[in-house]
C-alpha cells in the first residue's frame, strides 16, 4: 500500500512532496502574511455569500479533519464578488487546529498564530465539475477564517455538537439545515492571493480570501475539536490534535488587501 500522507514525523508536511511534487511548487499555501508589505487594491470588490441551509448534507471525520459536505450539483450555495470573476459553489468546509490554544492556524498574520482556521471551499461553476476546476488557476476559491480564544460562539456549537457521532476516522453522520455564513465575522475585509490546497495533492488552483477579523470561540469549544480521533474505531486511539501545514515560501507572489 502506498504511504498515506499525514501530519506525523514520518508522513508529515516535510514529506508530502515525495508523493506530490507540486507541494514544492511556486504557489503553495499557507503563507505568512506581513501586513506592512501588503498593498490596498481599490479595485477589490466586497464579496457576498448566499448559502442555502438545505444544501448542507453530512459531517464526516476523514482522519485528517472534520468536514461538513454540501450539495454542489447545482448553484445552491454561492460565493461571488471580491477578487472573483465568476460564481463559485460551496462544496465543503473543514478546520485546522493544534494541540493547544496558542497555535493551530495555517496562515499567520505578522507572526501571530490563531487557535484554528476554518476553510470554506468553493469551486468555479463555469467548469463542469470540481475535478475539472482543480486543473485551473481560478478553479477554487477558499474563504479562510481565523478562530481566536474568547467568548463561546453559539453558532459554532452546532458543528461541535455533531462531533460525538463522528469520533473516529471513517464516520459520517447527517448534518442538515445549516448556513455557514453564521460563522462569518462582522467585518468582511480580506486579504487575497493565489495559492494552493494546504493538504495533498496541494493543487495550485486557489484564489484565497483570508478574512482579517477572526471569530472567537471558547477554550472548551477548542477542546471539543481535539476530542476527535485520527484512528478508526477498531484501531488503537490516536487523538486528532495537529492538522496544520506550516507556512510555505511566498516566492514573489503579491498579497492584496481589500481595505486600507
Curated annotation (Swiss-Prot):
Entry-linked Pfam families: Carb_anhydrase
GO process terms (BP): response to bacterium
Cellular component, GO annotation: cytosol
Cofactor (UniProt): Zn(2+)
Molecular function GO labels: carbonate dehydratase activity; nickel cation binding; zinc ion binding
Positions with a binding annotation for substrate: 198-199
Residues modified as Phosphoserine: 29, 43, 50, 55, 219
Binding site for Zn(2+): 94, 96, 119
Regulation: Inhibited by acetazolamide.
PROSITE patterns per the UniProt record, alphabetical: ALPHA_CA_1, ALPHA_CA_2
S-glutathionyl cysteine PTM sites in chain numbering: 182, 187
Modification Phosphotyrosine occurs at: 127
Keyword Cytoplasm found: yes
Function recorded in the entry: Reversible hydration of carbon dioxide.
Protein name: Carbonic anhydrase 3
Species, as recorded: Sus scrofa (Pig)
Lineage of origin: Eukaryota, Metazoa, Chordata, Craniata, Vertebrata
Gene designation per UniProt: CA3
Amino acid at each position: 500500500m502506498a504511504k498515506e500522507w499525514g501530519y506525523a514525523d514520518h508522513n508529515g508536511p516535510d514529506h508530502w512532496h515525495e508523493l506530490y511534487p507540486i507541494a514544492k511548487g511556486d504557489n503553495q499555501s499557507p503563507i505568512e502574511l506581513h501586513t506592512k508589505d501588503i498593498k490596498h487594491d481599490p479595485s477589490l470588490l466586497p464579496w457576498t455569500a448566499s448559502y442555502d441551509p438545505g444544501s448542507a448534507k453530512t459531517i464526516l471525520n476523514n482522519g485528517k479533519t472534520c468536514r461538513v459536505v454540501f450539495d454542489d450539483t447545482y448553484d445552491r450555495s454561492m460565493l461571488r464578488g471580491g477578487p472573483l470573476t465568476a460564481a463559485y459553489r460551496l462544496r465543503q468546509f473543514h478546520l485546522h487546529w493544534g494541540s493547544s490554544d496558542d497555535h493551530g492556524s495555517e496562515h499567520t498574520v505578522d507572526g501571530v498564530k490563531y487557535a484554528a482556521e476554518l476553510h470554506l471551499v468553493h469551486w468555479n461553476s463555469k467548469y463542469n465539475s470540481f475535478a475539472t476546476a482543480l486543473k485551473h488557476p481560478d478553479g477554487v476559491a477558499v474563504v479562510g477564517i481565523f478562530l481566536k480564544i474568547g467568548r463561546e460562539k453559539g453558532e459554532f456549537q452546532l458543528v461541535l455538537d455533531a462531533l460525538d457521532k463522528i469520533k473516529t476516522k471513517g464516520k459520517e453522520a447527517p448534518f442538515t439545515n445549516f448556513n455557514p455564513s453564521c460563522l462569518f465575522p462582522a467585518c468582511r475585509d480580506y486579504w487575497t492571493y493565489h495559492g494552493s490546497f494546504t493538504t495533498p495533492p496541494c493543487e495550485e488552483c486557489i484564489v484565497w480570501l483570508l478574512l482579517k477579523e477572526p471569530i472567537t470561540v471558547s477554550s472548551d469549544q477548542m477542546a471539543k475539536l481535539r476530542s476527535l480521533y485520527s484512528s478508526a474505531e477498531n484501531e488503537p486511539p490516536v487523538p486528532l490534535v495537529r492538522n496544520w501545514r506550516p507556512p510555505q515560501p511566498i516566492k514573489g507572489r503579491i498579497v492584496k488587501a481589500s481595505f486600507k
